[in-house]
Amino acid sequence: LLKHDTLGADAAQALKHTLLMFDAFHDVKELAAAGNAHARAVMQSWADAEWFTSRPQVPESLTVTVFKVSGETNTDDLSPAPDAMTRPDIPLHALAMLKNRRDGIEPEEDGKRGPVAFIAGLKDKGHLVAYVGDVVGTGSSRKSAANSVLWHTGADIPFIPNKRFGGVCLGSKIAPIFYNTLEDAGALP
């Protein structure tokens, strides 16, 4: 689309914030070398890291409402394996986060639906909700677990339905790969 007369500029704008280009990178590079202004603008934008520098600044300080989950929270608590079939539908799957009763956490329907209304009540206080645990994110379902946490604590991504970024997750210990997954999703672990 970079060569298209009417859509070239829009395509360039979209590509400036697209990072996973795989083999298509070479197509953009070749178009730029051949003199295509839109492709050159995309290459320059990537070189200038506009995809990163255009993101909102991290505030100097944050006021958060704490959602405290005692003990170890593994990824199966956040993204239960029996509900794996719903993982592609993040809002639906996030309903199962912390669905099993545990010390200090009262699910709406034990074994089926986590403390969704309780978390919503914390959000109603007007601040970010920070997920706070003792040990957080051990286990193998890191991305879907991060999606569940961010669904309840993050912010909508403009023009991307059913996906959120940002959020705050604190723990005495956060599993290293879960930590990296949260960072990749724009959260502050």
Predicted regions: what is each one?
Residues 4-9, 36-37:
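Alpha-helix N-cap/helix-start positions at coil->helix boundaries
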Residues 2-5, 18:
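Alpha-solenoid helical-repeat scaffolds
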Residues 13-189:
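Fe-S-dependent hydro-lyases/dehydratases of central metabolism
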Residues 1, 9-11, 98:
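Extracellular cysteine-rich microdomains
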